[in-house]
């Protein structure tokens, strides 16, 4: 009887230990995945920033300001490099429809000899930034990086709101660049 009780107690301790170890491993994996998600979000934030610059410069160039072409080429190369760096995360991003949309939009924007109007290209690039923001939002919500799905007023969720507000400013800057380029190239102002 004592031996049976001792064996039962030993089995119970082993099961509890295995359960605690599995729980600890699960937490560790989740924390590791969350760190990877943060690295992805940092990279996507850089990509958003460069796409916004690309949008403003390309709208300015297409509106007639040829002095911006060298800067546009440089930013275009940076955007290409950032998309290339995102390939590391492709297995994780593959499941996000917004990422696929972003890739398709970049291909359309980056086509040489695009016969698109400046306004249509501006719209495509704005859609591209929105797709990237949606990708960031999906990652943030999946790994609980925003409190209560952005409903909480705590600072933990404000970073995502800040990205959306920066995009509104970026749209305004792009339009302003185009307007300035158009007015500068008018014969009568």
PLM regions and their residue ranges:
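Hydrophobic alpha-helical segments
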Residues: 2-189
